[in-house]
Amino acid sequence: MIPALFGLGCILGGLLSPQCLGILLIYFALTVAYSLYVKKVVLLDVILLAGLYTIRIMAGSAAVGIWPSYWLLAFSMFLFLSLALVKRYSELVIMRSLEGKQAKARGYEMTDGELLATMGTASGYLAVLVLALYITSGTAQVLYGRHQLMWFLCPLLLYWISHIWLIAHRGRMHGDPLVFATKDPTSRVLIFLMLAIAVSAV
């Protein structure tokens, strides 16, 4: 079943564009590498996870014939790295509550929790910095008629990233943070507000 789906995906990707096919092949190779080996390698696993999410954006853009801007790629890389780290951090918190201070989760030890939280929040805030720099760039001023409105995105995104990490720190994050965001009322409101601002700024 999986080989058939992979073959179908390659055919569809090739029909869309050679770039799309190339990105799909790279994504497949990295996904296999992650499943077989990388997911057990501390730190490399979260970096590759963030990269895979970013490659999805590239694949979607290639499918419609629009190459994503470097602003978007930088923003998504930092944001998804933060989310990958919060997932590992939340796993550590849950394992600690079940097995105590000697517990491990995917190679990470309990003593790694503080470091993961520091790296994760820093990565999330770097995504906000990239967004702020983009808003001040000439590109944003050309694409958005009311680009000043986009400044409201920064505090909202800061709040959401901080909220996600606070939830994880309290041991209430279970599973994928993106799935959590679709169920969390606070995240829903913040995402709706950010989408509304982005649309209004056009």
Question: Which residues make up each language-model segment?
Answer:
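Alpha-helical transmembrane segments of integral membrane proteins, especially early/N-terminal helices
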Residues: Y34-A50, M77-Y89, D112-A122
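Small-residue-rich segments of transmembrane alpha-helices in multi-pass membrane proteins
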Residues: I47-A63, F78-F80, A103-G113, A181-L193
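Multi-pass membrane catalytic core of lipid/isoprenoid biosynthesis enzymes
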Residues: M1-L24, Y70-L81, A117-G124, P185-V202
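Cytosolic, membrane-interface loops and tails of multi-pass inner-membrane proteins
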Residues: R88-L115, G171-D176
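Intramembrane alpha-helical segments
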Residues: M1-V64
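Helix-coil boundary and interhelical linker segments in multi-pass alpha-helical membrane proteins
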Residues: C10-G22, I57-F75, A132-W151, V199-V202
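Transmembrane alpha-helical segments that form the membrane-embedded catalytic/substrate-channel core
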Residues: F28-Y37, M58, S76-S97, L126-A132, ...
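A C-terminal functional module that forms or caps the active site or interfaces directly
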Residues: L126-T182
